[in-house]
């Protein structure tokens, strides 16, 4: 499954696609877990192990695709009024994606351990008589044989060794692929960690700007208050001066009137 681009910058549709992928990853992880539980039982078979590998690789591709979608979602432009809501939505998607990845990586590691255990049993059973009862009849036939005459046993021994080597190579190839896929998921975890860190820096910057704006508003209000106080004091002083001048004029007028009288 290859990565397909977003949905024309529509955040709602992109968020829906991310949520859908997260649900698929969770569902696939549960299916992988059920398949792992069948290994070593009568239901075990080479076909079952092949299905397990295909399901694991499909889920790994889903995880890579979702990682790209979340990056795209985080880079979409937004208005100041929608910024907080967009952050809440992205935080929720990242948290859900992280939870689904954690569970998926858990079953990945279980699958790798099961494959390693199987290879070890095949190697051991190729050196001793008899097989291992945990594996299915199809795979058990590759490494077990019945007591026969010495020439027949030697011939069968050679056939089993060749089949065992082929089986070991297949399983070791599967182990290498699983380990590579686990590393891919580790890289996605790093991406998510970086996104959370960068988003935190952006939010801190926004909050700092808001705080600075609030400080500026408070300072402006204080300056306006001081200006109003100064204006009131100036008016009061002017009124007092005018009152004194009026009194002075009246007194001078009375003095002049008294002299003339």
Swiss-Prot record:
One of its GO terms (biological process) is positive regulation of receptor localization to synapse. Pfam families: SNARE (PF05739), Syntaxin_2 (PF14523). Residues 260-261 are vesicular. Residues 129-150 are annotated as: Disordered. One of its GO terms (cellular component) is endocytic vesicle. It is a single-pass type IV membrane protein. The chain crosses the membrane at residues 239-259. The modification N-acetylserine is found at residue 2. Keywords: Acetylation, Coiled coil, Endosome, Membrane, Phosphoprotein, Transmembrane, Transmembrane helix. Belongs to the syntaxin family. May be involved in protein trafficking from the plasma membrane to the early endosome (EE) as well as in homotypic fusion of endocytic organelles. Mediates the endocytic trafficking from early endosomes to late endosomes and lysosomes. This is Syntaxin-7. The gene is STX7.
């Amino acid at each position: 499954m290859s990565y397909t681009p977003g949905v024309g910058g529509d955040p709602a549709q992109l968020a829906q696609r991310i949520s859908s992928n997260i649900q698929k990853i969770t569902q696939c992880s549960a299916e992988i877990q059920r398949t792992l539980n069948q290994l070593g039982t009568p239901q075990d078979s080479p076909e079952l192990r092949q299905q397990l590998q295909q399901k694991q690789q499909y889920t790994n591709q889903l995880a890579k695709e979702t990682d790209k979608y979340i990056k795209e979602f985080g880079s979409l432009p937004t208005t100041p009024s929608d910024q907080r809501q967009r952050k809440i939505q992205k935080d929720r998607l990242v948290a859900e994606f992280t939870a689904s990845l954690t569970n998926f990586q858990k079953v990945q590691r279980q699958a790798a351990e099961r494959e390693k255990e199987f290879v070890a049993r095949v190697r051991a059973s190729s050196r001793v008589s008899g097989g291992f009862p945990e594996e299915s009849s199809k795979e058990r036939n590759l490494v077990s044989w019945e007591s026969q005459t010495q020439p027949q046993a030697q011939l069968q021994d050679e056939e089993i060794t060749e089949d065992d080597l082929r089986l070991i190579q297949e399983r070791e190839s599967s182990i290498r692929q699983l380990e590579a896929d686990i590393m891919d998921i580790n890289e996605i975890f790093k991406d998510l960690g970086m996104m959370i860190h960068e988003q935190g820096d952006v939010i801190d910057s926004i909050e700092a700007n808001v705080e600075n704006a609030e400080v500026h508003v408070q300072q402006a209000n204080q300056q306006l208050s001081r200006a109003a106080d100064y204006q009131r004091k100036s008016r009061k002083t002017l009124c007092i001066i005018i009152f004194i001048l009026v009194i002075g004029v009246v007194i001078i007028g009375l003095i002049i009137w008294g002299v003339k009288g």
